[in-house]
Amino acid sequence: EFGNNPYNIDMPVGTDGKMDPDAKLNYWGDWRNALLKSRLRQEYTIDFSGKNKKADYFISAGYLNDKGVFSIQRFERYSTRANLNYNVNKWLKVGTNISLSHSVREGSASDQTVWLLRTMPTVYPIYEWDSATNAYRLDKNGNRIFDYGNYRTSWSGTNPLADDTYNKSPWTHDDVSNRTYFEITFIPGLKWRTNFSVDFYQYNYDGYVNSEYGFAAGYKGSAYKESDRNLSYTINNLLTYEK
C-alpha cells in the first residue's frame, strides 16, 4: 500500500500488466540525497614547544567540527594539552602532563539509517503528499510536513529527517586527565620514581521527543536527562637500578 497514489493517473498499470506510457511520478522520495551530504570537516591545531638546560615544555590546542556525511549528525570538540619536565637539581626531576577536552555530539546515523537508505522505496515520499491538490501539504508556517508513513508496509512511523528536525538529543562529554611524577636519583643508576595519575570523565545527555509528530505523539512527547561522572586515580612507586 502506497497510502497515496504516487502517479498522475489512477491506473498506472494496465490490465496487460504493463506501465501506462502516460504515467508519471508526482514526486520522488529521494531519501539518499536528503540524508547523504558532502559536508565540510574542519580541524585546527596549534602548538608551542621549547626547552633549555633545565626544562622542556609542550602546549597544544585543537578544534574539530565534523558534520559527517549524514545530514542528521554533528560533532564538535575543543581540546588542549600541556606537558612540562623540570630538573630541579642534580638529583630531583619533576614533570606533569595535563589534557582537557569538551565535545558535543548530536544526532546519529546508525546501521538502521544505512539500511533505510538501501531498502526504502522511492514511492514513499519524505513529505506528505496531497493527492487532491497534487502538492505537498504545508503547515501553518508554510513548511512541508514530514511524512512518517504510518500506512507503509515497511518502515512505518519512520522518518529520520523529521526526527532530526523536531527532536533533540545532544551528548556532552568532558574529559580531564593528568599525569604527574617526581624522580629522585640517589646514586648514578639508582632511582626512585613516583607516578600519580588522575582521570575525570563526565557526560550529560538531554533528550527531547516532540509531542506533535512521530512515535511519541500518542503520549504527548517525552523529555529525559542522563548524566554520569567518574573519577579515578592511580599512584605507583618504582625503584630501579641500572648499571
Annotate each PLM feature:
Residues 1-27, 38, 68-75, 79-177, ...:
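Surface-exposed loop/interface segments of Gram-negative outer-membrane beta-barrel transport/assembly proteins
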Residues 58-60, 95:
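Periplasmic plug
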Residues 29, 34-35:
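C-terminal beta-signal and adjacent terminal beta-strands/loops
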Residues 61-67:
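Transmembrane beta-strand segments that form the barrel wall of outer-membrane beta-barrel proteins
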Residues 50-54, 63:
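A generic beta-sheet turn/junction motif
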Residues 40-46:
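Solvent-exposed "coupling" segments
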Residues 41, 52-53, 89, 185-189:
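Outer-membrane beta-barrel channels and translocator barrels
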Residues 47-49, 60, 83, 179-181, ...:
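Outer-membrane beta-barrel architecture
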